[in-house]
């Protein structure tokens, strides 16, 4: 009878994650300097994200009613992240009302 040495050791691999995007990049504190309140930021970013999303949908149809992203989008970046970056860079002006 032969016994084979079997090692129960496992090689733990280190998880690799992409850096977080969205509300963590750009930082929320920088974004809040651009608007009057966190609620205004939510509404402002959501409206712009809807415009960007509509632009992408209409681009497939050849209709350009909305303005596309004002910053260069990263591959796979969501419209809300694009909108937050536009706000942070100062490409959009927020008006209460």
Curated annotation (Swiss-Prot):
Superkingdom field: Bacteria
EC number of this enzyme: 2.7.7.6
An example Gene Ontology CC term for this record: DNA-directed RNA polymerase complex
Enzyme class at the top of the EC tree: transferase
Gene3D superfamilies assigned: 3.90.940.10
GO biological process: DNA-templated transcription
Keyword Nucleotidyltransferase: yes
UniProt entry keywords in alphabetical sequence: DNA-directed RNA polymerase, Nucleotidyltransferase, Transcription, Transferase
Reaction catalysis annotation: RNA(n) + a ribonucleoside 5'-triphosphate = RNA(n+1) + diphosphate
One MF term in the entry's GO annotations: DNA-directed RNA polymerase activity
InterPro entries: DNA-dir_RNA_pol_omega (IPR003716), Pol_omega/Rpo6/RPB6 (IPR006110), RPB6/omega-like_sf (IPR036161)
Function: Promotes RNA polymerase assembly. Latches the N- and C-terminal regions of the beta' subunit thereby facilitating its interaction with the beta and alpha subunits.
Subunit structure: The RNAP catalytic core consists of 2 alpha, 1 beta, 1 beta' and 1 omega subunit. When a sigma factor is associated with the core the holoenzyme is formed, which can initiate transcription.
Family, per entry: Belongs to the RNA polymerase subunit omega family.
Protein name, as recorded: DNA-directed RNA polymerase subunit omega
């Amino acid at each position: 009878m032969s016994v084979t040495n079997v090692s129960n050791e496992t090689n733990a691999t280190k998880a690799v994650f992409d850096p977080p995007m969205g509300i963590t990049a750009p930082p929320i504190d920088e974004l809040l300097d651009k608007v009057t309140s966190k609620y205004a930021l939510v509404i402002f970013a959501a409206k712009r994200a809807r415009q960007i999303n509509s632009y992408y949908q209409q681009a497939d149809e050849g209709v350009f009613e909305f303005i596309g992203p004002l910053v260069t989008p990263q591959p796979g970046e969501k419209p809300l992240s694009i909108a937050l970056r536009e706000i942070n860079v100062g490409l959009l002006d927020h008006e209460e009302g």
